[in-house]
């Protein structure tokens, strides 16, 4: 009688082999004692390299499936014109081989030392699991009885269902042949795949010869025929017997555990992290892997964006836009007034949620300060994350409309040089100082700068009308006569003889507009100048 193998004696994937999926993140394959995964990256063993040569691996897998080394299953063409391929269908000339592989995506063509060759080897290990055919690759068989069941299972599948597709061009006598997969006609002269177990005249396009379950190309044209469909070895075995989700082996024991549409050996139904038994216990499935409650909370629990505490698996959770909250009145509430938002519409803004637009505007009305050199940014750049701001860029001598905290204020900025926009420091000296109603707590929004801390000599501003060629829009005046002023005869705070009032958003409580009269001496001087001033 054969001695039962422990599974660790034979392994097609050698220790330390690199992972094709993780790359350098995985230090190398380290076999789990009974799972078919790497302990480092937790990827399946077929994702890693192998110690055998390509030809030895191919022949080994074919032997596991067929029980012999028949040429029809293992030998490939030795023509020198097709040596660039790791495998080719037998019986084809180089031109037909080229037409056959032209039907496949580039990344799946098995050129030597290419991604297509790695894909082929990976699919051989996945579609034809060696532990489905030989006990020496298994680690979960209990006793010689289960080993005998595996042997009978493998022999019956090989005799009744196993086959390998044959590729040949469609001849003139077979015109009108239809693909069994897509239903489209295969033209005369095109290559097609024939499966003898399906019957005479049944054929497929090369790209349509896929497993009926996983829809992957049948590697090396090896198929298992069942009830009018072709399957890969893995999924055909699952039609006959359940497969353990943990160890990836076919279950031959009398009892097994079934949950979430999957099966396990009874002893293998355990936490993926700590491997504690889960029979009769609460568990959570994540990515088709069961976890106990404590491991799941430690690895995957989310934290509430309101209180910062961990959200337990027994607590209600609300999720929106990558944020998480406890489903409680104290956590899922308006960030301004604290009103509960459970079952109500809400407005997300700046990582907070609000019950209304007014609350969101009040909470974002005050923003962090910025230096005077950044003042031009507040008028020229659009703040995209603030829904209440609409800013427009300065264009020459045009009027710039800036909306701050929901109130629209128009500022007229005219530069002394007609071809450039007004510099930020050429604002009137009456604009110094931040208004009292603004705070600077929110870091995501700009507000007016605090210029009171910057001690500097008040800048005297001289306003000058643009020349006739520079005026983009018609200008109307309410006074019948006017005069151009200069820094020598215009009093500060006045422009063209009229007082300059503060903008509404800069007016402090109790603000009174400046007097509308000007000194008598100044008025007399202007009247004298009016006589000699004219418009061209």
From Swiss-Prot:
Bilayer disposition of the protein: Peripheral membrane protein
InterPro entries: LIM1_prickle, LIM2_prickle, LIM3_prickle, PET_domain, Pk/Esn/Tes, Znf_LIM
Source superkingdom: Eukaryota
Record-level Gene Ontology MF annotations: zinc ion binding
Sequence ranges assigned to domain LIM zinc-binding in this UniProt record: 177-241, 242-302, 305-366
Keywords: Cell membrane, Cilium biogenesis/degradation, Cytoplasm, Developmental protein, LIM domain, Membrane, Metal-binding, Mitochondrion, Repeat, Zinc
Protein's cellular compartments: Cytoplasm; Cell membrane; Mitochondrion
Domain PET: 66-175
Biased composition (Polar residues): 450-467
Composition skew (Basic and acidic residues), residue ranges: 438-448
GO CC list: mitochondrion; plasma membrane
Biased composition (Low complexity): 474-487
GO biological process, one term: cell projection organization
Stated family: Belongs to the prickle / espinas / testin family.
Protein task: Involved in the planar cell polarity (PCP) pathway that is essential for the polarization of epithelial cells during morphogenetic processes, including gastrulation and neurulation. PCP is maintained by two molecular modules, the global and the core modules. Proteins of the core module include the proteins Frizzled (Fz), Disheveled (Dsh), Van Gogh (Vang), Prickle (Pk), Flamingo (Fmi, Celsr) and Diego (Dgo). The core module proteins develop subcellular asymmetry, accumulating in two groups on opposite sides of epithelial cells.
Protein name per its UniProtKB record: Prickle planar cell polarity protein 3-B
Encoding gene, per UniProt annotation: prickle3-b
């Amino acid at each position: 009688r054969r001695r039962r193998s422990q599974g660790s004696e034979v392994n097609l994937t050698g220790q330390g082999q690199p992972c094709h999926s993780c790359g350098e993140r995985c230090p190398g394959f380290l076999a789990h004692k009974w799972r078919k995964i790497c302990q480092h990256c937790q990827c399946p063993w077929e994702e890693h390299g192998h110690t055998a040569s390509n030809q030895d691996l191919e022949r080994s897998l074919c032997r596991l499936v067929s029980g012999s080394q028949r040429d029809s299953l293992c030998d490939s063409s030795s023509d020198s014109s097709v040596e660039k391929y790791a495998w080719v269908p037998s019986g084809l000339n180089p031109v037909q081989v080229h037409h056959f592989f032209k039907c496949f995506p580039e990344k799946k063509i098995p050129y030597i030392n290419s991604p297509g060759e790695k894909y082929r080897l990976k699919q051989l290990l996945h579609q034809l699991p060696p532990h489905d055919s030989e006990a020496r690759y298994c680690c979960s068989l209990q006793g010689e009885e289960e080993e005998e069941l595996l042997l009978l299972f493998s022999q019956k599948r090989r005799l009744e269902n196993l086959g390998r597709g044959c590729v040949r061009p469609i001849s003139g006598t077979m015109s009108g042949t239809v693909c069994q997969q897509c239903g489209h006609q295969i033209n005369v002269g095109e290559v097609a795949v024939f499966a003898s177990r399906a019957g005479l005249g049944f054929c497929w396009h090369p790209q349509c010869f896929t497993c009926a379950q996983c829809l992957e190309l049948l590697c090396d044209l090896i198929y298992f025929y069942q009830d009018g469909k072709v399957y890969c070895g893995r999924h055909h075995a699952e039609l006959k017997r359940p497969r353990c989700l943990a160890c990836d082996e076919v279950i031959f024991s009398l009892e097994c555990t079934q949950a979430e549409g999957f099966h396990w050996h009874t002893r293998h139904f355990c936490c993926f992290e700590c491997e504690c038994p889960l029979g009769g216990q609460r568990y959570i499935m994540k990515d088709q892997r069961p976890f106990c409650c404590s491991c799941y909370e430690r690895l995957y629990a989310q934290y509430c964006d309101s209180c910062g505490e961990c959200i337990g698996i027994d607590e209600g959770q609300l999720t929106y836009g990558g944020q998480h909250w406890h489903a409680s009145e104290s956590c899922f509430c308006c960030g301004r007034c604290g009103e509960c938002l459970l079952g109500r519409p809400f407005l997300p803004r700046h990582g907070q949620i609000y019950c209304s637009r007014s609350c969101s505007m009040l909470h974002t009305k005050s923003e962090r300060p910025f230096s005077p050199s950044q003042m031009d940014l507040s008028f020229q750049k659009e703040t995209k994350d603030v829904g209440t701001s609409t800013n427009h860029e300065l264009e020459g001598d045009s009027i710039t409309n800036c909306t701050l905290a929901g109130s629209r204020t128009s500022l007229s900025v005219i530069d002394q040089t007609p071809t450039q926009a007004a510099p930020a420091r050429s604002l009137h000296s009456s604009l110094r100082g931040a208004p009292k109603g603004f705070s600077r707590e929110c870091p995501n929004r700009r507000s007016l700068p605090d210029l009171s801390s910057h001690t500097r000599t008040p800048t005297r501003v001289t306003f000058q009308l643009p020349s006739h060629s520079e005026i983009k829009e018609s200008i109307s005046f309410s006074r019948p006569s006017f005069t151009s002023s200069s820094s020598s005869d215009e009093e500060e705070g006045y422009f063209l003889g009229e007082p300059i009032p503060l903008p509404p958003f800069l007016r402090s409580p109790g603000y009174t507009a400046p007097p509308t009269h000007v000194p008598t001496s100044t008025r007399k001087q202007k009247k004298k100048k009016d006589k000699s001033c004219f418009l061209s």
